């Protein structure tokens, strides 16, 4: 992370001291991730997060000096806080070195400058290092690192894995402070600011209040005081609830007396004592039910939505259109990976570096995103009919499913959900509509996110945006959900997808690993920012929606355009 004067790494959550930050509760997400609660990430200037400089090696900005030094040598915190890193030779400002090294086990450490300068050999030499530039070109060939002992080497090849065959990983995790593990993996050179240095592992859920807001509030209350209640029960024994009620709950609006409290506490325990694991798809199923269960309007806590009338010409394709005036998403940071993206949609993704709390409490950092959205449920009957009438679709569906399964297995992950042609159709529709909405709603396509609901008895998409501000977003997106505005948006999005500026090349693409598991799709027609997409711009095919110049089957929206 770049700061004003330096590059920093935020320390693991066990080093955080902000224990007064708000606790966040979501029963399904907590059970899915096996956590007691989540804690809100501090966002004000009065609540800092602990961080350290990284990389440790810095370069003097004075080109006549160009000292390459380890900041940890003779480090003085007061001087560092005043003006950032300074050269130990000439006291000029210094900047963090451009290169670092990582490995497939997600370790991260400084580039081995001394090893490199001495001909890629281990050495006992402690001479001063300098990073010189010949100034001839901007390539690495023009840079070389030189030791005081006169050993020197050009940085040519410094970004090639093959240059580090004799150098093994140090097992370092800079965010864990002096914790190193034994690791013999070969290192991978990286640019310090490259996107593959850090891939966050995130899980999220749309908060769906229960039918009774009182029950929802009680769940949160009991979850927050569960440890205190257990302490009372252990210390006092029988009839502990009378003491707890008199000490802490007298006058509490949710409980009339101690007997009412113990009855509701017992009910809470009975509803939360299941040891059964929750899959991520079950969280989505609960969200899907919430969007499809009410008749006209619903307003419960942070969930406020209303149904739009589906026009006659849309009814063969859509069962329901919902304007979500108010949504709350809980976004949890599990940990991270380097060099590759984390495993999707599972509660314990493999190979990620998990954030570790201090041992006394089992939590993860999270943020609450308040926003708005548009939910569209597809017509299940039409989907079934479309699949039955096109003999080529089962083959294409199997192609997508097998490609996705092979990709998951190649990563060493477990195949949990089948991504068939219905998912690809829904996913592509979401992308096309995001691109069109960004032109009309006032939000860029980067700000609009998708949630795809596909599975048994599920076929829908949620497009939403939000902000960490309690007031949420500005209403521009949900306004586009009004049918008089949404109808032309959908039609325009589909018409734009018929032709691509990369046709005929794009239209002839077949599903393949070389094309990111996509069929007829590219950045010109179907792809959006990866922060908006559930699957990293994979599993897209516009030919499933509209007739392209190379279509081999009837598209889903055949009769609409």
UniProtKB/Swiss-Prot annotation:
The entry's keywords: Antiviral defense, Cytoplasm, Restriction system
Entry's localization field: Cytoplasm
Description of the deletion phenotype: When this gene is missing the DISARM system does not confer Nf, phi3T or SPO1 resistance in B.subtilis.
Main location: cytoplasm
A single Gene Ontology CC term: cytoplasm
Transmembrane segments: none
Annotated coiled-coil segments of the chain: none
Paired cysteines (S-S): none
Function: Component of antiviral defense system DISARM (defense island system associated with restriction-modification), composed of DrmE, DrmA, DrmB, DrmC and DrmMII. DISARM is probably a multi-gene restriction module, this subunit has an unknown function. Expression of DISARM in B.subtilis (strain BEST7003) confers resistance to phages Nf, phi29, phi105, phi3T, SPO1, SPR and SPP1. Protection is over 10(7)-fold against phi3T, 10(4)-10(5)-fold against Nf, phi29, phi105 and SPR, 100-fold against SPO1 and 10-fold against SPP1.
GO process terms (BP): defense response to virus; DNA restriction-modification system
Keyword Cytoplasm: yes
Pfam families in the cross-refs: MZB (PF09369)
Name the record gives this protein: DISARM protein DrmB
Domain of life from the UniProt record: Bacteria
């Amino acid at each position: 992370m770049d700061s004003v004067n330096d590059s920093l790494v935020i320390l693991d959550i066990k080093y955080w001291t902000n224990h007064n930050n708000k606790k966040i509760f979501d029963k399904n997400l907590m059970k899915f991730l096996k956590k007691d609660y989540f804690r809100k990430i501090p966002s004000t200037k009065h609540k800092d997060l602990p961080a350290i400089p990284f990389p440790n090696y810095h370069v003097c900005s004075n080109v006549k000096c160009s000292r390459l030094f380890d900041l940890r040598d003779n480090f003085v915190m007061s001087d560092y806080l005043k003006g950032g890193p300074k050269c130990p030779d000439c006291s000029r400002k210094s900047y963090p070195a451009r290169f670092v090294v990582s490995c497939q086990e997600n370790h991260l450490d400084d580039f081995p400058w001394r090893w490199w300068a001495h001909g890629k050999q281990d050495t006992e030499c402690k001479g001063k290092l300098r990073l010189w530039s010949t100034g001839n070109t901007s390539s690495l060939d023009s840079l070389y690192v030189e030791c005081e002992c006169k050993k020197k080497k050009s940085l040519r090849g410094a970004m090639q894995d093959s240059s580090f065959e004799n150098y093994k990983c140090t097992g370092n995790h800079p965010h864990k402070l002096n914790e190193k593990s034994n690791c013999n993996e070969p290192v991978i050179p990286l640019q310090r600011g490259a996107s593959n240095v850090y891939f966050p592992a995130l899980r999220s859920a749309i908060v769906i209040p229960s039918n009774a807001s009182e029950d929802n509030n009680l769940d949160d209350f009991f979850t927050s005081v569960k440890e205190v209640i257990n302490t009372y029960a252990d210390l006092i024994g029988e009839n502990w609830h009378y003491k707890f009620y008199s000490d802490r709950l007298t006058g509490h609006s949710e409980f009339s007396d101690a007997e009412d409290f113990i009855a509701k506490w017992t009910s809470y325990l009975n509803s939360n004592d299941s040891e059964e694991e929750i899959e991520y798809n079950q969280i989505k199923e609960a969200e899907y039910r919430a969007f499809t269960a009410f008749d006209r309007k619903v307003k419960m806590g942070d969930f406020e939505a209303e149904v739009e009338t589906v026009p006659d010409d849309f009814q063969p394709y859509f069962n329901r259109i919902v304007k979500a005036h108010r949504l709350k998403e809980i976004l949890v940071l599990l940990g991270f990976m380097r060099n590759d993206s984390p495993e999707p949609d599972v509660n314990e993704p493999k190979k990620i570096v998990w954030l570790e709390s201090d041992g006394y409490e089992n939590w993860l950092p999270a943020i609450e995103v308040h926003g708005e959205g548009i939910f569209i449920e597809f017509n299940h009957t039409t989907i079934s009919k479309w699949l039955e009438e096109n003999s080529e679709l089962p083959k294409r569906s199997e192609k997508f499913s097998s490609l996705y399964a092979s990709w998951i297995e190649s990563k060493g992950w477990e195949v949990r959900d089948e991504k068939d042609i219905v998912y690809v159709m829904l996913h592509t529709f979401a992308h096309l509509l995001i691109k069109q909405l960004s032109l009309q709603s006032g939000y860029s396509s980067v700000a609009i996110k998708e949630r795809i609901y596909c599975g048994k008895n599920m076929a829908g998409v949620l497009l939403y945006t939000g902000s960490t501000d309690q007031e949420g977003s500005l209403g521009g997106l949900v306004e586009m959900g009004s049918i008089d505005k949404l109808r032309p948006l959908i039609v325009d999005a589909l018409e734009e997808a018929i032709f691509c500026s990369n046709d005929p090349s794009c239209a002839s693409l077949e599903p393949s690993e070389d094309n990111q598991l996509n069929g007829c799709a590219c950045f010109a027609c179907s792809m959006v920012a990866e922060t908006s997409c559930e699957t990293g711009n994979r599993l897209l095919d516009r030919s499933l929606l509209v007739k392209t110049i190379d279509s081999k089957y009837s598209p889903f929206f055949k009769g609409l355009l």
